[in-house]
């Protein structure tokens, strides 16, 4: 599928600073399209039904057009604004026995060739029937039979949603997932054993536009973004695909123009990955640094490229220790701290925080208890 520039009466010229960043952030459909100095019509409707051709086959798809005026400001207009109306988050609208059938819009590999493994950004069309809030998760039921329960479907796999409630196309009809393909290699032979590969992650990464997908949810309240205080500080810590909910947070803070939702606090992201090629959504985050230097900080831990102060591999907990004085002061002043990623990251982080607390003459157990009591501590690991 391609997105063609059009010339009509009333069209305006749009100069795009970063083609690749815009393509990944908004259009997601075609990796070869050029956006420089194109003219875009302000009157094209959303969701024009078309077909896309992939591997010689036709797939139904949707042309998405972004409103022209959005490019003249630093933020994007979103709709429908009614998504802001509910006072409580949507929960479990669809359950495993009565799941929702959505469609795949696009699947894009979002890591470089030197990254260990493959991670995909997957856009799903739910047609506005599966509303969610930032920080929630969808459940995915892969096709096929559960090998442990003959005749029964596969178990639900949960994935953090990597977009705001308005989706990657800002129209409230899509949601995005960030999925690492789970591949098993035999420790003795070093060869891949497809029978032990992750069923759901491989299904998602192999999906094509137009493929159907069974969704449950949305679920989760622990990682919901508190928005009652626009001046709040949010410290976000992630490894790998754990960055997914933070992409939604940051888009809401810095990319989208939502009425009465102006963020003037501090968002501080710590991301741990193997190497530069493994960085996820790096162009988006780097743009926020440029556009909002007073409200966004971004620190990376590249375990295969950097060394910590002891000469070992640089992990995210080493970055936390490096900035521990600032982090503890921010927590003392009410900052929220979030953790998302592999559960194996938490022991090292907890040990670091405990050691730093003791060096400061504080009890970490007491401090952690207080953070939980004040609802400043948010953890979602898998």
From Swiss-Prot:
Its cofactor is FAD. Its EC number is 1.18.1.2. Pfam families: NAD_binding_1. Induction: Up-regulated by nitrate in roots while down-regulated in shoots. Residues 97-225 form the FAD-binding FR-type domain. The modification Phosphoserine is found at residue 201. Maintains the supply of reduced ferredoxin under non-photosynthetic conditions. This is Ferredoxin--NADP reductase, root isozyme 2, chloroplastic.
